[in-house]
């Protein structure tokens, strides 16, 4: 417990110092209804209140988002954000991919499925458009209110390349040193310490919700990764750097290979853009 509290305080202190050093006037956050954005809202509220700057939250629905995501986002946003609103960019998305929408729902040629694409690859491509539309909205707010966009990625997602380039990333990443299982531990710690019933309800909602990318690609993160749980994923990822966990490959077999391949194949995203030295 003390270790978790120490990491929470360290994150808040570093965010606070960054805001002060760079004279930031506001923080903008996309509130998805998921665990990571919810935990960020909770941690950042304390910092923003102390510095007297707004935490501006937006839930942005696009076509495939589920009602439970919207409900969880509303609970978090109303409890922790200075300003919170729910937007629907479904029509913006449809205007992008369809010819003559709303009169016609024929896909524009560049957004149709190619002969060489699998169904999953095609869904990822369209999902990336949704992520980038959301980020257009959030970065517009950041310029309007002279703020920073919060990146809700955690260490697990970074190592798996589980984000959209020029999409669902941001300027400041509070959870960048926490594996997904660590984020769950932080959320449970915050739940246990919280006295307000409305806030406890909000925290429980983000802990219990099925983790998804919010892009309608698959029904869960686990389905997309081909594994059973984040405990499994994080143990595999940690084994890449810790020799004492060398038996993990035998323990998880096919799941290990899937995580390893995803880690290797997403290296380009962690080193983007590739800079030519001359």
Question: What are the functions of these language-model segments?
Answer:
Residues 1-161, 187:
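ATP-dependent adenylation/nucleotidyltransferase module used to activate substrates
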Residues 151-264, 271, 278:
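Mid-to-C-terminal catalytic subdomains of enzymes
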Residues 2-6, 10-13, 17, 258-278:
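N-terminal charge/polar-biased segments
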């Amino acid at each position: 417990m003390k270790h978790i509290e120490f990491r929470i305080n360290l994150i808040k202190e570093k965010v606070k110092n960054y805001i002060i050093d760079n004279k930031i006037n506001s923080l903008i956050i996309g509130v998805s209804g998921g665990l990571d954005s919810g935990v960020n809202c909770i941690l950042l509220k304390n910092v923003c209140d102390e510095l007297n700057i707004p935490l501006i939250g937006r839930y942005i629905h696009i076509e495939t988002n589920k009602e439970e995501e919207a409900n969880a986002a509303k609970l978090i946003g109303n409890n922790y954000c200075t300003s919170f609103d729910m937007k629907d960019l479904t029509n913006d998305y449809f205007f992008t991919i369809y010819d003559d929408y709303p009169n016609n729902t024929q896909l524009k040629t560049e957004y149709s499925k190619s002969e060489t694409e699998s169904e999953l690859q095609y869904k990822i491509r369209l999902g990336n458009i949704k992520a980038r539309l959301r980020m257009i909205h959030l970065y517009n707010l950041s310029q309007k209110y002279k703020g920073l966009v919060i990146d809700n990625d955690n260490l697990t997602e970074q190592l798996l390349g589980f984000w959209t380039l020029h999409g669902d990333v941001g300027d400041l990443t509070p959870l960048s040193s926490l594996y997904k299982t660590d984020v769950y531990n932080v959320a449970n710690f915050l739940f246990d310490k919280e006295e307000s019933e409305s806030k406890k309800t909000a925290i429980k909602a983000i802990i219990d919700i099925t983790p998804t990318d919010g892009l309608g690609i698959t029904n869960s993160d686990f389905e997309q990764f081909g594994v059973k749980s984040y405990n499994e994923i994080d143990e595999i990822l940690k084994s890449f750097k810790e020799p004492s966990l060398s038996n993990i490959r035998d323990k998880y077999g096919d799941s290990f290979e899937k995580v390893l391949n995803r880690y290797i194949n997403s290296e380009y995203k962690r080193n983007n853009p590739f800079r030519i030295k001359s």
